[in-house]
Each structure stands twice: as structure tokens, then as C-alpha cells.
């Protein structure tokens, strides 16, 4: 083995071998296990959230494959309607071509061309992270088979009256000219204004003051609402008010929706331009007056003066006109949530438009029942409340989008506006007996991307055909996804799965948290805190990192801020940590919380873990060869240390299975880390040395230790493999000649199971006692600055016959690992010189201090340490007593400072105790 572990030297070659040998394909006749990859956008590249979830899915897939289950991780990509269309439009614009210069067919040809040339970026990146998906089965939401499934579902739902065309309020993006889903609307807090407008009461000197952040929408007002219990305005309920700047009056209505305490307690109701107002309007049978065109300009339903104006130009004009008329009571600054299009960044308008809808209530009822009955289980269980909350209040689903790229709606219109739905124009003509002389025109719209995604678990397995894959792998085993798409994707898959297959789409839903930066902030381009998983794997220099983080940023001030912060956080850029260290970090962070703080320091720690494992394997292989192990006829004798590590291994194996079954990847990673680093490397390898290096030790004992070393290493590699596939495969290939394995690939070997024969609580108790004794003696050495090489005497007080017998049994190990030259037993009242003492149960371990240290030199060193600690304490106290710091600094920074102070004070107390002991010598 090479002296050092170099991930870059092995990862790509190993993955290529796995894929080319088809190791990722389902095999055998074991239990079925299937995971569907949530299809990433074909335009996308791998981000931290993908890396996190893909690691968890891959760990589950590799675990079940090694259990002998017939395992399928089904990959594929999403056509990502808006995103893909925008990418191709921008490419065309760079060539001086507008989408509108092309026919629909010409444009779609360009999109397909782009998809073939550039649409596999994310799948290549998945390979770099070790994803063991079955690439031979890769699907695309617009491939032929999935398109046929989409058509069948649409036609059937329409024929059953569950799809209809209607006029409702939608999120409208005026720049893109399409309806968008709630998930594509980002609401960020921005600085705005609250305009207080007077609405004069008809035939009265009174007026109502209404506060609004969108004065242009008053052109579509249909009422002013007050709370029914608001005594200030109760006398006006049922009266009319003049609508400012418009030649019409509107009623004053009472509704519980109004917050008496906000603004004046009066709310303008604009049913065609606000989702809450729309509901109020329905309750009171108010008209719906749409005042906007699809381009965001004022339409003919408004006074002539404003017609044709852009909505924000109209806003300025309306404010001026209100002032002129004396109807603007006041203007005040106001922070508000502004809904912007995720792709366009323009302000989204609630707009009444004709769209296609799915009637969701009949589909939601069985989907709610499936979770209530326990057929589908959310992990953590608390997420089922979120699911029920959404499903109990479900609205009809707008499924049409005003785009060219996507599944075109299979509906045709004649000249009289009649709608015909079918699989093709010929199908429609045949079904409805329409001859060729009657012109038919297909609907221009495409389906919401989430419509095809909702069919993903069964359409990818061949539905509507009854394929062997559908029979074997549906329902799938588990879905791994984020809480942000429980409604948009998870719920819709459950509804569609039950409707079209009669079965649930998956048995369990594991909801992960969202990856944030080390301080808990959302990762975003504008914050400049985004990390690319592959930059952590391969490393990136500072200049390239800054260029990546600041590309396409318009504002110099933002660019400068991000550059400065990046230089401070990564002065040397990011080191190459390799895939396994990153994957292990992801698993260690996969707790049950909503948010996951990602800290690069942890990746560095787990890179050290890879090094530790590599060095342990080198030690084992250097001390193990075929002659020495002698798997033939030689007898084996197992030392207490061998028996101890084999017993501890069973405990670890048991926990690992439990944590896989309960999706506690954080506890799983921690369990493996503790066993490998502390029990196997720090203790067992050290305990093996006295036996292997002792010329007097029995050959059978040496064989037993060598066999244990290699067996436990083999089991460790298998236990770790689902989390760290590359390093484990590389080492395992070098161990197979000693373990009678087939050596094809670790991923095709058998996952460890608990062997009850090796569980030995008595030996664990003995070795735990021995470890505590050695640890106590090492602590004394460290605290007293005794040279690690110096042999020291040990005195023991309060010894019992049982413990004396135990010490005799382990005397060689105790002396070797603690560097003890002689063990002396004291009578109860026997005096010893000034000693450092450790208490271990009922006995005392004493190390006389005289002659072991240079008293003056040690006191001088301690005084320097104390001076430094006093300075640290003073600085931390100064910060924490300064209101400028405590009032302005983020909570996590204040908490860090408090921790720093507490640690410094503990360290100071220990040093003072040590100083007192030295002074008494």
C-alpha cells in the first residue's frame, strides 16, 4: 500500500470499473429494495442539497445491495420547463436570435439539441460522488415512454371530470408570460412603503382610511372590509364608499379576515389581484375586476388615463393623483415580503387567467387515508402533520404553463371553442366523429413540470405497461427528499400512485433537513456562501473560488462584500478532501432537524479519519502475510484483547443495522467513527503490538491476533462501505487474499451480521478497566509534562485480591502502554512521597513526582501558560461586557465567545491545581 491515501488517484478509476462491470444493476432473488432518485433538473449542476440527499440514498442502496436484497436505485432527470426554456432562449439571444423568430417546432429542435449536448452535467457530477444508480435504466421526463404515461393520465382524468379548464387566480410572471407554482415564487423582505388612502363615504362627510403597499390595485377594488366587532366602523357596514380616482362606488363589508390592529383597521378588497381578497370576494359574492394584462400593463377595465401604463408607472401616477385630490392621508416606510419569480426576479402578480386544473379533493382523500392508516410512514414522524395540514386544505392544482418546452396539453379546439381531449388529433377526430374539413387547433400550453414528476415512481418502471420491473419494484421502498417539496411532489406522487396503480408509491418517506452554512444561513448566490460539493472533493484555489462566487453578480458592492468574506474564510482556497470525507460529513450531519449547518472543519476531520483508516490498514497488512496468518492447520489462540475487539465489533454491527433501519445516519456515522478511531485504532492496534513484538509469545497467540486484525479490518471496511465507498474498496481489494472473499468488489460482498458467539461482557468489563487505568496514567504523564519515553514507577493503594489478580493478568500490557518500570502495592497506611494520584474505582494509582520533572522549568512554563489564559479570559470578558458586541453580534457568535471564556476558565483552574502540586514537591 502507498504510504499516504490519495483519493484523486483512485476514485475515478474505481467508479469506471463499477459502472462498466454493471455492479449497480439489480441482481439475485433476495428481498426487493427500490429508491427513486428525485429527478434533478436537466439544466442543473450538483449543489450541496443534492450531494447530501444523494449520499443518503447511495448509502441505503449500497447497504441493501450488501444485505443481498435485489436493489434498484432508479435514476433520471426532469425536463424542467421554465429553466430549460430560459437557458436555450439566452443561448439564442447571444447569437442574436429571439425565440419568437422561430416556429415552435424549430425552437423545440434547438432545446433537444441542447439537451443532448449539455444536459448530462449533473449525471457526470453524480458519478464523482459515487452514486451507484443503475445508469442502464436512466429516464427523462420527456422520453417517449414517460410522455405516453403523461398523456394517458391527462386523458383519463379529463374523461372522469377530474381535469377541467377554468378561470382562477394564479401566480403570474409578467416577464416570462406564464403561470408559476408557489415553489417558483421567492418572498424576501424588502423596503417599501405603506400608503394610507382616503375612501369617502357616499352621502357623508366621513371617510375610511385604507393602508396598502400596492396602490395601483385600487383600480380593481370591489369593497372595503372591516372587522365585524370593530365598534369604530360598525355603523358603516352596508354603506357605499367612493373608489378614489374611479367613477364607481364599492360597499363596506364585515369580515373576520380583517386585523383590527393593523393600519387603520380597514382593508381594501381586490378579488382579482390578491389571494386572500379572492377568498373574501367569494364569501361576499363580490365581482372580480381584472385590471392587468398578461404583460403587467393596465387594461381597459381601468379609467382611460391609466390604460396601457406599466403597473409600476401607474403606481407613481396614482400616488400623484391621490395627492392632488387630497385623498392620500400619509406615506410611511414599511418592510414587506415581496413575491418575486425565482427565474425572472420580477414581482409576481396574482392574476385571473384561463388555465387547466386538476380537481384534487377526490384524489387527496385516499392519499390522506394512506398516511393515517400507516401504509406510508414519514420519518421523522412530525412531518405527517405538515402533510395533513396541506392536504386537508388542498386547492385545485393549476397544471398549465404558457411555455413551449414541456408536455403539450393533449386538447384540441374547433372554431366554436369546443374542447376535445385525446391522444392525438386523429384520436380526437375518430372518437368525436369530426371530419377533416373541420379545422382543429391544439392547445398552445404545456403541463406543469410537477405533473410528470408526480408519475415518476411508476412511469419510470414502465407503466402503463405491466412490466416485470413494475411488478418487482413497485411500490418502492423509501423516498428521500426535503421538507420543502412535501406538498409539491410527495403528496402528488401519493395521489397519482393510488389513483393509477391502486397502490402507494413508497412505504416510507425520509425527510432531510436543508443544508445551510456554518452559521445557519441559507446558501445563496447573493449571500456569496454557496459551496460546490466538487470543489470540496477536488479542491479549488482562492481566485477561482472568488470568480465562481461573484460571476453574474450585477452590483459591485455585493461583489466586493463576497470577495472580502471569501478571502477571510478561505485564504488558501479549499483543499481537496476527496469524496469519502465529504460523504461521511453529510451522513454525520443527517440529524432529525429542519436545518443542517455545514462546516468545512468537519470535512477536514473526516479526511483525517480516512488517513487514520489507511494507516491502520497499512499496519495490519505489514503485520500480516499468508505464512504468519496460516489459515491452514495452525492452531489459533485469541488474547483477551482479541476477544474484546471482537465483542465490541458485535455491539457496533448491531447499532449500525439499527441506525440504518431508523434512518439515523448521524448516529450511524458517529458509531462507526468511535469504533474505528478509538476502539480499533487507538486501543486494539496498540494492544496487538506487545503480542506481535514478543518473541516469547505463543505462535498460536500471534496467529489469533493476526487473524483478528484482518477479520475486524474486513468487517470495518464493509460496515463503512455504504458511507465511504472508494477508500473501503481500495483497501478491501488488498485484504481479500487473507479472507477467502471472491474479491470482485466490496459492494457485492456480504454486509456484517452480529455473531452472538463473540459477545463477551466479562472480557469487555476487564478491558474497559484496563483502558481506564492506562488512560489515567497517561493523563498524569501529560499533566505533569513527564517525557513519554521515561519509564516511571507505579504505586497502587487499596488493592483487592481480585484486582491484584487482574493486574497480574494484564501486567505486560499495562507496563508497555503506560511506560511503567515497576508496580508496587502499598499497605493502607503506608506513606509515599508527593505523588500525582488517579482514583480508579476503589483503588488509587500514584506516581511519585520527585526526580521526574524539572521543578523550576515546569513552574516557569506554567506561569507563561497562565499569563496567556488570563489575557484570553480578559479579552472574552471585555467583549461579553460590551453592549456594542452583545446587542449587535449574531447569537451564534456570542455563544462561541461564551464557550471560549468557559473553556479558558476550566483550563486555568486545572493549571492552578497542577502548579500547587509542583510547588509542594
From Swiss-Prot:
Its EC number is 6.1.1.9. Monomer. GO terms for cellular component: cytosol. It is found in: Cytoplasm. Belongs to the class-I aminoacyl-tRNA synthetase family. ValS type 1 subfamily. A motif ('HIGH' region) lies at residues 40-50. It comes from the Bacteria. One of its GO terms (biological process) is valyl-tRNA aminoacylation. SUPFAM superfamilies: Anticodon-binding domain of a subclass of class I aminoacyl-tRNA synthetases (SSF47323), Nucleotidylyl transferase (SSF52374), tRNA-binding arm (SSF46589), ValRS/IleRS/LeuRS editing domain (SSF50677). One of its GO terms (molecular function) is aminoacyl-tRNA deacylase activity. InterPro entries: aa-tRNA-synth_I_CS (IPR001412), aa-tRNA-synth_Ia (IPR002300), Anticodon_Ia_Val (IPR033705), M/V/L/I-tRNA-synth_anticd-bd (IPR013155), Rossmann-like_a/b/a_fold (IPR014729), tRNA-bd_arm (IPR010978), tRNAsynth_Ia_anticodon-bd (IPR009080), Val-tRNA_synth_C_sf (IPR037118). A motif ('KMSKS' region) lies at residues 522-526. This is Valine--tRNA ligase. Catalyzes the attachment of valine to tRNA(Val). As ValRS can inadvertently accommodate and process structurally similar amino acids such as threonine, to avoid such errors, it has a 'posttransfer' editing activity that hydrolyzes mischarged Thr-tRNA(Val) in a tRNA-dependent manner. Its main location: cytoplasm. ATP binds at residue 525. Keywords: Aminoacyl-tRNA synthetase, ATP-binding, Coiled coil, Cytoplasm, Ligase, Nucleotide-binding, Protein biosynthesis. It comes from Legionella pneumophila subsp. pneumophila (strain Philadelphia 1 / ATCC 33152 / DSM 7513).
Amino acid at each position: 500500500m502507498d504510504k499516504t491515501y490519495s483519493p484523486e488517484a483512485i476514485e475515478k478509476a474505481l467508479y469506471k470499473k463499477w459502472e462498466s462491470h454493471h455492479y449497480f444493476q439489480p441482481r439475485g432473488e433476495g428481498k426487493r429494495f427500490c429508491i427513486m432518485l428525485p429527478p434533478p433538473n436537466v439544466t442543473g449542476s450538483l449543489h450541496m442539497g443534492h450531494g447530501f440527499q444523494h449520499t443518503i440514498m447511495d448509502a441505503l442502496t449500497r447497504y441493501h445491495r450488501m444485505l443481498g436484497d435485489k436493489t434498484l436505485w432508479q435514476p433520471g432527470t426532469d425536463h424542467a420547463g421554465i429553466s430549460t426554456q430560459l437557458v436555450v432562449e439566452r443561448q439564442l439571444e447571444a447569437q442574436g436570435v429571439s425565440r419568437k423568430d422561430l416556429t415552435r417546432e424549430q425552437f423545440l429542435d434547438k432545446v433537444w439539441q441542447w439537451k443532448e449536448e449539455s444536459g448530462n452535467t449533473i449525471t457526470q457530477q453524480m458519478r464523482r460522488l459515487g452514486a451507484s444508480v443503475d445508469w442502464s435504466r436512466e429516464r427523462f421526463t420527456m422520453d417517449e415512454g414517460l410522455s405516453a404515461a403523461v398523456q394517458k393520465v391527462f386523458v383519463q382524468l379529463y374523461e372522469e371530470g377530474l381535469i377541467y379548464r377554468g378561470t382562477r387566480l394564479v401566480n403570474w410572471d409578467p416577464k416570462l408570460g406564464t403561470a408559476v407554482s408557489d415553489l417558483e415564487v421567492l418572498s424576501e423582505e424588502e423596503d417599501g412603503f405603506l400608503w394610507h388612502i382616503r375612501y369617502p363615504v357616499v352621502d357623508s362627510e366621513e371617510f375610511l382610511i385604507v393602508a396598502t403597499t400596492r396602490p395601483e390595485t385600487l383600480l380593481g377594488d370591489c369593497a372595503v372590509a372591516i372587522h365585524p366587532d370593530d365598534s369604530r366602523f360598525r355603523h358603516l357596514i352596508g354603506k357605499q364608499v367612493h373608489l378614489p380616482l374611479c367613477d364607481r362606488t364599492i360597499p363596506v363589508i364585515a369580515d373576520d379576515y380583517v386585523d383590527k390592529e393593523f393600519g387603520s383597521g380597514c382593508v381594501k378588497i381586490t378579488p382579482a389581484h390578491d389571494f386572500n381578497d379572492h377568498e373574501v370576494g367569494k364569501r361576499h359574492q363580490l365581482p372580480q375586476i381584472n385590471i392587468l394584462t398578461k404583460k403587467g400593463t393596465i387594461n381597459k377595465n381601468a379609467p382611460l388615463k391609466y390604460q396601457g401604463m406599466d403597473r409600476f408607472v401607474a403606481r407613481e401616477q396614482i400616488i400623484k393623483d391621490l395627492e392632488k385630490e387630497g385623498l392620500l392621508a400619509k406615506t410611511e416606510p414599511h418592510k414587506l415580503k415581496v413575491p418575486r419569480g425565482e427565474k425572472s426576479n420580477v414581482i409576481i402578480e396574482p392574476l385571473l387567467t384561463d388555465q387547466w386544473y386538476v380537481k384534487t379533493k377526490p384524489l387527496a382523500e385516499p392519499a390522506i387515508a394512506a398516511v393515517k392508516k400507516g401504509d406510508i410512514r414519514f420519518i421523522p414522524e412530525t412531518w405527517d402533520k405538515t402533510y395533513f395540514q396541506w392536504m386537508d386544505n388542498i386547492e385545485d392544482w393549476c397544471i398549465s404553463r404558457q411555455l413551449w418546452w414541456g408536455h403539450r396539453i393533449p386538447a384540441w379546439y374547433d372554431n366554436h371553442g369546443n374542447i376535445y381531449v385525446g391522444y392525438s388529433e386523429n384520436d380526437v377526430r375518430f372518437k368525436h366523429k369530426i371530419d377533416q374539413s373541420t379545422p382543429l387547433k391544439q392547445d398552445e400550453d404545456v403541463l406543469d413540470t410537477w405533473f410528470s414528476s408526480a408519475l415518476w415512481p411508476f412511469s419510470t418502471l414502465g407503466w402503463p405497461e405491466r412490466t416485470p420491473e413494475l411488478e418487482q419494484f413497485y411500490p418502492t421502498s423509501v423516498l428521500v427528499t426535503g421538507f420543502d417539496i412535501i406538498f409539491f411532489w410527495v403528496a402528488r406522487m401519493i395521489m397519482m400512485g393510488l389513483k393509477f396503480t391502486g397502490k402507494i408509491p413508497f412505504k416510507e418517506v425520509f425527510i432531510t433537513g436543508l443544508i445551510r452554512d456554518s452559521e445557519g444561513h441559507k446558501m445563496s448566490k447573493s449571500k456569496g456562501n454557496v459551496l460546490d460539493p466538487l470543489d470540496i472533493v477536488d479542491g479549488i484555489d482562492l481566485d477561482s473560488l472568488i470568480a465562481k462566487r461573484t460571476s453574474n453578480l450585477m452590483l459591485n458592492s455585493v461583489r466586493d462584500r463576497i470577495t472580502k468574506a471569501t478571502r477571510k474564510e478561505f485564504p488558501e482556497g479549499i483543499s481537496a478532501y476527496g469524496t469519502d470525507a465529504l460523504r461521511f460529513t453529510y451522513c454525520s450531519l443527517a440529524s432529525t432537524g429542519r436545518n443542517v449547518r455545514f462546516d468545512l472543519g468537519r470535512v477536514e476531520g473526516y479526511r483525517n479519519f480516512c488517513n487514520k483508516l489507511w494507516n491502520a490498514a497499512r499496519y495490519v497488512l505489514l503485520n500480516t502475510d499468508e505464512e504468519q496468518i496460516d489459515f491452514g492447520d495452525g492452531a489459533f489462540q485469541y488474547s483477551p484483547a482479541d476477544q474484546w475487539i471482537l465483542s465490541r465489533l458485535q455491539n457496533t454491527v448491531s447499532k449500525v443495522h439499527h441506525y440504518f433501519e431508523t434512518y439515523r445516519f448521524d448516529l450511524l456515522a458517529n458509531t462507526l467513527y468511535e469504533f474505528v478511531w478509538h476502539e480499533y485504532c487507538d486501543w486494539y492496534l496498540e494492544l496487538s503490538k506487545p503480542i506481535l513484538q514478543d518473541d516469547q509469545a505463543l505462535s498460536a497467540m500471534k496467529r489469533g491476533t493476526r487473524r483478528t486484525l484482518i477479520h475486524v479490518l474486513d468487517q470495518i471496511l464493509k460496515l463503512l462501505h455504504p458511507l465511504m465507498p472508494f477508500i473501503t474498496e481500495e483497501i478491501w481489494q488488498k485484504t481479500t487474499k487473507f479472507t477467502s472473499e471472491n474479491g470482485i468488489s466490496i459492494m457485492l460482498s456480504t454486509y456484517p451480521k452480529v455473531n452472538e458467539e463473540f459477545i463477551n461482557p466479562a472480557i469487555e468489563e476487564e478491558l474497559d478497566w484496563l483502558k481506564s487505568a492506562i488512560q489515567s496514567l497517561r493523563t498524569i504523564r501529560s499533566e505533569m509534562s513527564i517525557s513519554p519515553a521515561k519509564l516511571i514507577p507505579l504505586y497502587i493503594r487499596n488493592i483487592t485480591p481480585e484486582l491484584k489478580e487482574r493486574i497480574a493478568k494484564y501486567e505486560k500490557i499495562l507496563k508497555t502502554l503506560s511506560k511503567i518500570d515497576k508496580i508496587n502495592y502499598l499497605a493502607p497506611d503506608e506513606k509515599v512521597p508527593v505523588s500525582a494520584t488517579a482514583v480508579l474505582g476503589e483503588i488509587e494509582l500514584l506516581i511519585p513526582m520527585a526526580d521526574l520533572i524539572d521543578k523550576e522549568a515546569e513552574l516557569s512554563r506554567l506561569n507563561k501558560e497562565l499569563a496567556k489564559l488570563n489575557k484570553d479570559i480578559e479579552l472574552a470578558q471585555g467583549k461579553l461586557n460590551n453592549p456594542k458586541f452583545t446587542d449587535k453580534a449574531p447569537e451564534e457568535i456570542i455563544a462561541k465567545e461564551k464557550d471560549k471564556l468557559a473553556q479558558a476558565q476550566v483550563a486555568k483552574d486545572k493549571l492552578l491545581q497542577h502548579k500547587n502540586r509542583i510547588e509542594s514537591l
